[in-house]
Amino acid sequence: METTVRKQKKNLETKKTSIYSLQLHEMQDWLKEQGEPKFRAGQIFDWLYKKRVKNYEDMSNLSKGLREKLSNSFDITTLNTLVKQTSSDGTIKFLFQLYDGYSIETVLMRHEYGNSICVTTQVGCRIGCTFCASTLGGLKRNLEAGEIVAQVVEVQRALDESEERVSSLVVMGIGEPFDNYDNLMGFLRIINHEKGLHIGARHMTVSTSGIIPKIYKFAEEDLQINFAISLHAPNSELRSKLMPINRAYKLPDLMEAIKYYVNRTGRRITFEYGLFGGENDQVEHAEELAALLKGVKCHVNLIPVNYVPERDYVRTPREQIFLFEKTLKDRGVNVTIRREQGHDIDAACGQLRAKERKEETR
């Protein structure tokens, strides 16, 4: 009987490109190289994203020869569900195992307007935010575009049982999306495409801790995707304490990049502001935040801190949260308090992590 370690070694040695990593035009190019008509790409995408098959044998309108070529060239990435937890509020957290034994977490959130999925872009994270569980083990590796796509496909398969669909997504899971920029953009284009899962660009949100060069690059992209910044502090000194990345990408420079993005795209930006008891949640912090954001087309999302055992932060009292919100509103800032989801299964903001570690290969 094969051990887990041996299976992982075998997977690493035989791994092929994920077919989920290919955009439609890339599939068409590959088909042309194989002497196949490009319209087959649409048929293949239909099998992958509409029928959501798990093997090539099921693609019955393709020739046996083409199915064999596909099988020899690409894997249909499947994620092994290690754990599936359901919260009292209906939120579902999936712990998925990857081909090399690493694991990631993906969250399905229920809203009145539909089902939203929170996807992961990296195994671990290098950013080192002092309040977040995702960064505790450091960064292991980037996910391929196909591995990010596969998260959405797997969750959609789970929803197929109740004839529901994923209607929106947020890229706010484990990892810094802009540290995996090319795979992130490939994923977004595949998911957005009408031949893919066809989730509208305006129903997708990407969040970053503030990788400034990539913010400028993102401003030039042709997808009208919602954009969020993990801010969490109204000044550089406090932000550097909470988010070490601020030492590399200073707050004044970050604000310049944000203003460029807003002016270039005409789109409103969202600032995520976690409230940490006694750290960044006082009236003076709210006043300073309002001054920082003055003149910026934006929305502030206040996030009460979620419990992480290895971190020392405590939740801001409810009355203080409302006072912080009121202080911002009184100064003309568009602000809401995020509805908490999945807290009881560690699926809320800042709580995601890979709880199953990769076994050492020998």
Curated annotation (Swiss-Prot):
Q: Name one Pfam family in it.
A: Radical_SAM
Cofactor mode of binding and number, as noted: Binds 1 [4Fe-4S] cluster. The cluster is coordinated with 3 cysteines and an exchangeable S-adenosyl-L-methionine.
| Positions with a binding annotation for S-adenosyl-L-methionine | 175-176, 207, 230-232, 306
Biological-process GO terms, alphabetical: rRNA base methylation; tRNA methylation
Q: Which residues form the active site?
A: 105 (proton acceptor), 349 (s-methylcysteine intermediate)
Q: Does the keyword rRNA processing apply?
A: yes
Q: Please give the catalytic activity noted in the UniProt record.
A: adenosine(2503) in 23S rRNA + 2 reduced [2Fe-2S]-[ferredoxin] + 2 S-adenosyl-L-methionine = 2-methyladenosine(2503) in 23S rRNA + 5'-deoxyadenosine + L-methionine + 2 oxidized [2Fe-2S]-[ferredoxin] + S-adenosyl-L-homocysteine; adenosine(37) in tRNA + 2 reduced [2Fe-2S]-[ferredoxin] + 2 S-adenosyl-L-methionine = 2-methyladenosine(37) in tRNA + 5'-deoxyadenosine + L-methionine + 2 oxidized [2Fe-2S]-[ferredoxin] + S-adenosyl-L-homocysteine
Is tRNA processing a UniProt keyword of this protein? yes
What Enzyme Commission number does this protein have? 2.1.1.192
Q: Where in the cell is it found?
A: Cytoplasm
> What GO molecular function annotations does the UniProt record carry, in alphabetical order?
4 iron, 4 sulfur cluster binding; metal ion binding; rRNA (adenine(2503)-C2-)-methyltransferase activity; rRNA binding; tRNA (adenine(37)-C2)-methyltransferase activity; tRNA binding
What is the superkingdom listed in this entry's lineage?
Bacteria
The protein's matches in Gene3D superfamilies, at most eight in alphabetical order, are given as: 1.10.150.530, Aldolase class I
Report the GO terms under cellular component: cytoplasm
- What cofactor does this chain's UniProt record say it requires? [4Fe-4S] cluster
Q: Which UniProt keywords apply?
A: 4Fe-4S, Cytoplasm, Disulfide bond, Iron, Iron-sulfur, Metal-binding, Methyltransferase, rRNA processing, S-adenosyl-L-methionine, Transferase, tRNA processing
User: Where does the record place the Radical SAM core domain?
Assistant: 111-344
Binding sites annotated in the UniProt record for [4Fe-4S] cluster: 125, 129, 132
Cystine residue pairs: 118-349
Q: Give the protein's biological function.
A: Specifically methylates position 2 of adenine 2503 in 23S rRNA and position 2 of adenine 37 in tRNAs.
Entries under PANTHER family matching the protein: 23S RRNA METHYLTRANSFERASE, RADICAL SAM CORE DOMAIN-CONTAINING PROTEIN
Question: Which family is it part of?
Answer: Belongs to the radical SAM superfamily. RlmN family.
HAMAP family from the UniProt entry: RNA_methyltr_RlmN (MF_01849)
- More about this protein: Reaction proceeds by a ping-pong mechanism involving intermediate methylation of a conserved cysteine residue.
What's this protein's name?
Answer: Probable dual-specificity RNA methyltransferase RlmN
From which source organism is this entry? Bacillus thuringiensis subsp. konkukian (strain 97-27)
Q: What is the lineage of its organism?
A: Bacteria, Bacillati, Bacillota, Bacilli, Bacillales
